[in-house]
Amino acid sequence: MKAALLYEGKAKKVYQSSEDEHQLVLSYKNDATAFNGEKKSQFEGKGRLNNEISSLIFQRLHEAGISTHFIKRLDSTQQIVQKTSIIPLEVVIRNLATGSITKRLGIKEKVSFTPPLLELFYKDDALGDPLINDEHALLLTDITETELAEIKDKAREVNAALQEIFQSIGIKLVDFKLEFGRNKDGEILLSDEVSPDTCRLWDIETNEKLDKDVFRQGTGDLITVYQEILNRLEVHV
């Protein structure tokens, strides 16, 4: 199913599909990184968990009418997706205050954002993925004002759908990051992944962290909390 390796990132390898030039094979790795790659480790089974979690969530997003690059899960660690040209922006949606924004703006932990706060970051490892505004986004990428508005609207739609999904399994969607890309027809699709690597997820009852923060902060076992997310999704999704 896969041919040449096109790109290797922190969490996935991207291969050209051997069966369709407009499709890719994403292979999820067991690597975990934090603090822009300064903290690194490997966890047996992490790639499988993220692949299964992201596949389930993309399926639910499709059911909610949201266009994504996801086609199907190929095996335990791989999925087939539409080939997209990734737009070098990370779109972050924050429903509750935690992490960098509390330090950057002095906002108290767990403050609720109503409406949810949307932030843009420029994807550039050398620059540390800086926070940017709309005008920066138009300057630094090839997107138009109309496309930027579309990306923001899609991100908010994804947030609403994800909040419903996670609330149904007893989890608060605190914040998350998204990436978008254009397919061969120029359609903007949600790309990359949606998993505990890219979302902050807290148990509704206990506020226990069920995401990569347990690795960042050294407060728990990553595989245990990722498996908990998958278990809940498999029962309720």
Swiss-Prot record:
InterPro entries: SAICAR_synt/ADE2_N, SAICAR_synt_PurC, SAICAR_synth, SAICAR_synthetase, SAICAR_synthetase_CS
Pathway: Purine metabolism; IMP biosynthesis via de novo pathway; 5-amino-1-(5-phospho-D-ribosyl)imidazole-4-carboxamide from 5-amino-1-(5-phospho-D-ribosyl)imidazole-4-carboxylate: step 1/2
Gene3D superfamilies, per the entry: ATP-grasp fold, B domain, Phosphorylase Kinase, domain 1
Catalytic class of the enzyme: ligase
EC number from the UniProt entry: 6.3.2.6
Catalytic function, reaction form: 5-amino-1-(5-phospho-D-ribosyl)imidazole-4-carboxylate + L-aspartate + ATP = (2S)-2-[5-amino-1-(5-phospho-beta-D-ribosyl)imidazole-4-carboxamido]succinate + ADP + phosphate + 2 H(+)
Keywords recorded for this protein, A-Z: ATP-binding, Ligase, Nucleotide-binding, Purine biosynthesis
Family: Belongs to the SAICAR synthetase family.
Name of the protein: Phosphoribosylaminoimidazole-succinocarboxamide synthase
Source organism: Oceanobacillus iheyensis (strain DSM 14371 / CIP 107618 / JCM 11309 / KCTC 3954 / HTE831)
Lineage of the organism: Bacteria, Bacillati, Bacillota, Bacilli, Bacillales
